[in-house]
UniProtKB/Swiss-Prot annotation:
GO-annotated biological processes: translation
Name of the gene encoding the protein in the UniProt record: rplU
Natural source organism: Neisseria gonorrhoeae (strain ATCC 700825 / FA 1090)
InterPro entries linked: bL21-like, bL21-like_sf, Ribosomal_bL21, Ribosomal_bL21_CS
Family: Belongs to the bacterial ribosomal protein bL21 family.
PANTHER family noted in UniProt: 50S RIBOSOMAL PROTEIN L21, LARGE RIBOSOMAL SUBUNIT PROTEIN BL21M
Highest taxon above the source species: Bacteria
Keyword set, alphabetical order: Ribonucleoprotein, Ribosomal protein, RNA-binding, rRNA-binding
Protein name: Large ribosomal subunit protein bL21
Length: 102
């Protein structure tokens, strides 16, 4: 059984027991969260597709960790103008573990 959920502006294919990193969610460590924006649920041969979401469907997940991703380096330069700009960015993330799909 698997589901497709939307969180943080992205879509993820998830199944029970799977761990994944999503955009930062304001929740405490070891707390349970419910992802209610479920786009699709597949269980063997039966497949439910929402328009856009499936009513009453939810995916329960446990918050495992919060952290920051790897640094992305940005370098801007204008040729012949002696303009150079260096910048870095680290995106915050939340690691979750899927507990149940309903």
């Amino acid at each position: 059984m698997y589901a497709v959920v939307k969180t943080g502006g992205k879509q993820y294919k998830v199944s029970v027991g799977e761990k994944l990193k999503v955009e930062q969610i304001p929740a405490q460590l070891d707390s349970q969260i419910e992802l209610t924006e479920v786009l699709m649920i597949a269980d063997g041969e039966s497949v439910k597709v929402g328009a856009p979401f499936i009513e009453g469907a939810k995916v329960t997940a446990k918050v495992v960790a919060h952290g920051r991703g790897e640094k992305v380096r940005i370098f801007k330069m204008r040729r012949r103008k002696h303009y150079q700009k260096r910048q870095g960015h680290r995106q915050n993330f939340t690691q979750i573990e899927i507990v149940a799909i309903a």
